[in-house]
């Protein structure tokens, strides 16, 4: 809590930050040795903000989105190991070169509310102003963690933990065709989103041809938050089990419930979302 001096006003005014400590608190990890991606990403608070927001950190991980994704969306993604909290994205720059499977160490500033691309990246933990980078080795890999669409649903209690991570959902059916992404459900009946912002041309063409009721054996990609929603970013056809794709002619699509969501986290956002289940 802080108070001003009361000069030129009726009295001393005070302010408290964070205003709601059930939503967010101040603090960060202290430890011997290097900070990990998990340290940067993990939070106990529902805001999802990194405890290192605004701090310069150095982390190491294996590239899961390389030059091909940088060419499409201007970012890279790295992950230290399989599982939640272990992935993060960072801004690229002209001349940067990182290949899928490179183990890299990068230094940058943790940013939750991108000052340049607010609506695109706000509430997605990422590294900006990357000052130093080193390729330690090549030819590495990270296994995706298999999750359910419930885990990746917009209102899931664990959805934040998969941000920046390589994930796989299996035996899913296309439930909705949105202007910029697709909703899929597994046996749970709960929808998560898949997207083509990071996809190569072949994968983008495939996704563009999806129909309501299309069933897919598995979808893999990097889970991220952008343009106000969580989604799986498909990279290439290696992320799709295409041999198991078929149309379920008996699939019946209808919303069971709908909710009008507030324009969180930005109340001035002119877009209002109706979410159907």
Labelled PLM ranges:
Residues 1:
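Extracellular, beta-strand-rich glycan-interacting domains
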Residues 4-245:
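OB-fold nucleic-acid-binding modules
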Residues 248-264, 268-277:
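Glycine-centered coil/turn sites that cap beta-strands in beta-rich domains
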């Amino acid at each position: 809590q802080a108070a001003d001096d009361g000069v030129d006003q009726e009295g001393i005014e005070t302010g408290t930050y964070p205003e709601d400590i059930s939503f967010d608190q101040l603090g960060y990890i202290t430890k011997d040795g290097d900070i990990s991606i998990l340290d940067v990403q993990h939070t106990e608070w529902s805001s999802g903000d990194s405890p290192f927001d605004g701090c310069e950190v150095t982390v190491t991980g294996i590239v899961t989105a390389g030059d091909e994704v940088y060419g499409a969306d201007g970012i890279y993604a790295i992950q230290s190991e399989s599982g939640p909290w272990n992935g993060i994205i960072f801004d690229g720059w002209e001349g940067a070169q990182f290949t899928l499977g490179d183990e890299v160490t990068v230094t940058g500033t943790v940013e939750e509310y991108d000052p340049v691309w607010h609506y695109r990246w706000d509430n997605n933990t990422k590294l900006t102003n990357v000052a130093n980078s080193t390729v330690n080795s090549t030819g590495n890999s990270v296994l995706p963690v298999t999750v359910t669409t419930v885990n990746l649903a917009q209102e899931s209690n664990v959805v934040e933990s998969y941000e920046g991570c390589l994930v796989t959902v299996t035996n899913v059916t296309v439930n909705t065709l949105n202007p910029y992404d697709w909703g899929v459900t597994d046996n749970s009946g709960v929808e998560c989103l898949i997207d083509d912002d990071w996809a190569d041309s072949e994968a983008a063409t495939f996704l563009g041809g999806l129909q309501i009721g299309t069933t897919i054996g598995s979808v893999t990609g990097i889970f991220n938050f952008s343009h106000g929603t969580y989604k799986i970013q498909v990279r290439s056809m290696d992320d799709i089990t295409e041999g198991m794709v078929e149309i379920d002619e008996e699939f019946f699509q209808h919303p069971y419930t709908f909710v009008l969501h507030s324009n969180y986290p930005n109340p001035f956002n002119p877009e209002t979302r109706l979410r159907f289940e």
